[in-house]
A protein has these predicted regions:
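Extracytoplasmic/secreted cell-surface and envelope-processing proteins
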Residues: 2, 13, 145-147, 178, ...
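Beta-sheet entry/capping signal
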Residues: 1, 18, 134-136, 165-167, ...
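A local structural motif
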Residues: 130-136, 156-177
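Extracellular/periplasmic solute-recognition and catalytic clefts
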Residues: 1-7, 27, 31-36, 40, ...
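Short helices/loops that flank or line small-molecule/ion binding pockets
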Residues: 15, 151-161, 175-195
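Ligand-binding clamshell of periplasmic/extracellular solute-binding protein-like
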Residues: 172-173, 191-215
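Append "and occasionally in soluble cytosolic enzymes with long acidic Gly/Pro-rich linkers
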Residues: 12-158, 242
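Extracytoplasmic/peripheral linker and loop segments enriched in polar/acidic and small residues
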Residues: 30, 166-177, 209-242
């Protein structure tokens, strides 16, 4: 799966996460990766599981059907409508979209957000801060999924068409997951948040389908168990520092 760190940077915005999924052709990806023997599911389950069978006739899941235009619509609705000059984004001449930050979005981590190659960063224009549509992706290696994501997502035309810039950093499992995603210094984290996305697997290691720990907001459990570091606005605002 492609997982996101959702408490800073571009991937803290749901519009960006949805746009990413709309510009990855998931059916094509699954067919290519499995040699035609795989199929797409829309969450951490498999169709033979009891949890899925119990709700398969009533559950409604977003299939994120591949659509560049739908991705653009998500970004526009989410406020990614500016260029690096603070003017209206023009796809004919501008490369990367920007979003004007306000309120709790003006966190310390957000204001320092930049691409890992240093090409793009948050800019200040006339007292306003604008964030670039940059996604810093870490890909574990050796990993065939990582290799396929490079062509199916990072360097794909669709990413450029929506005004998104994606950096790729090759990483081993421990430095990527525990160092950059979970920010553990003993695994190489240097104190500066960088990672927005990383690909890794979902394991089915329990007969009980319970993902409560994966989305906990309990501050005693959050850092170790919340897989996406996804807070609601109230939680984020408590940590707000300008």
């Amino acid at each position: 799966k492609l997982g996101f760190r959702c408490d800073f940077g571009s991937t803290s915005f749901a519009s960006v996460r949805r746009a990413i999924m709309l510009t990855i052709n998931r059916n094509e990806f699954a067919q290519t990766f499995t040699g035609g023997y795989g199929s797409v599911v829309h969450g951490p389950y498999y169709e033979g599981s009891a949890a899925y069978k119990a709700v398969k006739d009533t559950i409604k899941l977003n299939a994120y059907t591949y659509s560049v235009q739908s991705a653009i619509d998500e970004l526009v609705d989410g406020g990614w409508i500016y260029n690096e000059k603070g003017e209206k984004f023009d796809a004919a001449k501008d490369t990367v979209r920007y979003k004007k930050l306000s309120g709790y979005e003006l966190s310390s981590d957000n204001l320092k957000f930049k691409s890992t190659d240093g090409k793009y960063s948050v800019i200040k224009l006339d007292g306003e801060y604008y964030m670039p549509l940059v996604v810093n992706w870490y890909g574990t290696q050796p990993n065939d999924v990582t290799n396929q994501l490079v062509t199916a997502w990072q360097t794909a035309k669709a990413a450029k068409d929506i005004g998104m810039y994606i950096t790729y950093t090759s990483t081993e499992f421990n430095p990527g997951i525990y160092g950059e995603l979970y920010r553990m210094e003993e695994n190489g984290y240097d104190g500066t948040p960088k990672l927005n996305a990383i690909n890794f697997a979902t394991g089915f290691n329990s007969a009980v389908y319970d993902f409560a720990f994966s989305w906990t907001l309990n501050q005693n459990l959050y850092n170790d168990y919340n897989s996406a570091h996804l807070m609601d606005e109230a939680d984020f605002y408590e940590k707000y520092t300008k």
